Amino acid sequence: EITEIDNQRITTTNVQACYSKLIKPSSPTSIKVKDKDGKVYTINSGPIYANPIIHHQVNEKIGYLVYSAFESGFDQELFDVFKEFKSQNITELILDLRYNGGGDVTSANLISSCIAGDLCIDKTFASYRYNDERMKVLGNQRPIQKFAYSQYDNLSTSLSAGGLNLRKIYCLVTDDSASASELVINALRGIDIEVILIGTTTHGKNVGMEGVELTAGTDKYLLFPITFQAYNAKGFGDFENGFTPDYEINENKPNGEYFEGYGDFGAESDPLYAKAISLISGNEVTTPTRAVNQAKEQMLVIATPRLNRIGMIK
């Protein structure tokens, strides 16, 4: 039971104001909570930085990575995963971008460069088209960004320690796979790395944003207008309708009936993961038609509410 917010006792007359303060705090918030035994705890609000590396594992030379957002603040942790994959000599990779709405272009370059390894040296990761006025200043030449394998500036290092040199990967996708997630798919296909898509059609966001700071009086604003469209090394960038899966599986209705959830990430009760495993092994993996009825108390809900799509940010 929540009894106080910012030292203000909750009453029937102020409950709505307290609720608003709780869900949309304008300043640090302190709350008091009383448990069933009457013991009172004080909880202070603070920033939480969620690690986008949700899960990773290696099983029989197959690497599996669940990545929820391209957050450059966690690039070291991401690179460490690829170094682990390389140290275990994986030969196959399942990249799970089902709930990844995008993020930093730099992190998309990191993950793409580690996947490609030596195959991407001195090759184009992406080129960018801006509006007509800006393109005139650039001589109507799209600026090119190389794969960062040889030198990744955000970590001030080469990515060779995590380079996998893979010519094919399996990517799990949904409509929530957007922007920088699609940039990775497009960039790898641009250098002839086969990206097998399993799931449903991706969102279709081939444009990105740049941050602009504005000041109005004493107020400061940080805006992120859409300013560019991204293309791969082959000049392809028209994926505004999304990428169509090679193997279409709706994770909510894989067998024609609604699935409430699956087991842990990397479990073969997950039909998308199971399909990737079957394609790699050549053996069909059967997923239960009623996973929701099995050990329901242990369920990890996969069919999450739609996440905010944070876009492709330079």
Q: Which ranges hold each PLM region?
A:
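Solvent-exposed coil/turn segments that connect beta secondary-structure elements
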Residues: 7-8, 36-38, 46-48, 68-70, ...
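PDZ-domain C-terminal substructure recognizer with occasional recognition of PDZ-binding tails
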Residues: 17-56
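C-terminal "post-core" interaction segments
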Residues: 62-65, 69-80, 84-92, 101-314
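Conserved PDZ fold ligand-binding element
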Residues: 1-16
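A broad structural signal for short, well-ordered beta-strand segments within beta-sheet-rich domains
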Residues: 2, 50-54, 87, 166
